[in-house]
Amino acid sequence: MIKKRQTRIAMIAGEMSGDLLGAGVIRELKKHLKNVEFIGVGGPQMLEEGFQSLANMSELSVMGISDVLRRYPQLYFIRERLLKEWTINPPDVFIGIDYPDFNLSVETRLKRQNVKTVHLVSPKVWAWRQKRVYLIKKAVDLVLTLFPFEESFYQQYDVPAQFVGHPLADLIEINPNNADLRKKYNYKPDDTILAVLPGSRIGEIKYIGPLFLEVMQRIAVEMPHVHFIVPIACQELYPVFFKQFQARYSHLKIQIIQGNAREAMAISDVVLTKSGTATLEAMLLKRPMVVAFKWSKFTHAIIAPQVKIPYVALPNLLANKKLVPEFVQEKATANSITESVLNLLACPSQSNLNKQFTAIHHTLRQNANEKAALSILKILETSSA
């Protein structure tokens, strides 16, 4: 039986996607636990569910090795402050949401203190630095995976893991109808729209923002009738992108909005996005896309030799074949990306692609938040036994 005293659940989300996942799990856990406290680090979505954040989530947001090295003292201070708090007043369970390097170090320390640990969202050990699986095995009591191939990977190493599905697959309809949304953004039904997503971190926008602006400029020349909508993930990122826009591209007619990335993709004909969760959302919305990724040469030189996967776009990884065009690092040029986007804009109706996207959608639609919450409740029961 779960203890009648207040249940204390510690969580850390390091970025916007983790905040969204954390909020969903909190919502489900509250249905089962009436006297519960959620503490740690989270963003606005988790805060809306009653989460108490002990640090600003944006302080944890880093991209690439150089950014980690530069901000290591700050990250170290936050981690040690949290661990001190949880040593004095241990949680019943700790849930690390993605953000693996930081969360695994916290999980390792807490597990030594007999705190139950769950990691939600598998670190990409199947992609690179595979030896981390042995650290994960020591650090966590359970890994909750969003994709089926991840559960199979962990089974090879006897790591407790459960595929719970992806919350976005539950949230987004199998056959979405987004015609009415166009009115909200003052677009006509027959307008051709390109949604452009340059990233959700400062480091991503630094490298990808200028590239995507150059692509938009070239598309505007070739297809002047195309409308551009650019959702910026949060308020802190807006001035970063706007400065890039003002520097050389202020003549472009771009609708820049704060947040609402899913709506921007939903009303679009084609999506241009950096790799990451946005590629999954675009797939679930059944939108053809072009995917690009770029980071510092220093980070790329260190990480690239360790990468063990043929693709970076999630639709390609889930299908185990190239469904959507993707361009990484030196291949991510304005010429190559523009050509691919123009091809899709010329023929946005992709019935075969839509069928494959739909099949993957069904696989991922598992009522993920509920499955994750039930797994966490089982862990709580063992901790209180």
Curated annotation (Swiss-Prot):
Swiss-Prot/TrEMBL keywords: Glycosyltransferase, Lipid A biosynthesis, Lipid biosynthesis, Lipid metabolism, Transferase
A Pfam short name: LpxB
SUPFAM superfamilies attached to this UniProt entry: UDP-Glycosyltransferase/glycogen phosphorylase
Alphabetical list of InterPro entries matching this protein: Glyco_trans_19
GO biological process: lipid A biosynthetic process
EC annotation from Swiss-Prot or TrEMBL: 2.4.1.182
Coiled coil: none
Keyword field contains Cytoplasm: no
GO cellular component: membrane
Catalytic activity, reaction form: a lipid X + a UDP-2-N,3-O-bis[(3R)-3-hydroxyacyl]-alpha-D-glucosamine = a lipid A disaccharide + UDP + H(+)
Pathway in which the depicted protein is active: Bacterial outer membrane biogenesis; LPS lipid A biosynthesis
GO molecular-function term, one example from the UniProt record: lipid-A-disaccharide synthase activity
Enzyme kind, highest EC tier: transferase
Origin: domain of life: Bacteria
Function: Condensation of UDP-2,3-diacylglucosamine and 2,3-diacylglucosamine-1-phosphate to form lipid A disaccharide, a precursor of lipid A, a phosphorylated glycolipid that anchors the lipopolysaccharide to the outer membrane of the cell.
Name the record gives this protein: Lipid-A-disaccharide synthase 2
Record lineage: Bacteria, Pseudomonadati, Pseudomonadota, Gammaproteobacteria, Legionellales
Gene name for this UniProt entry: lpxB2
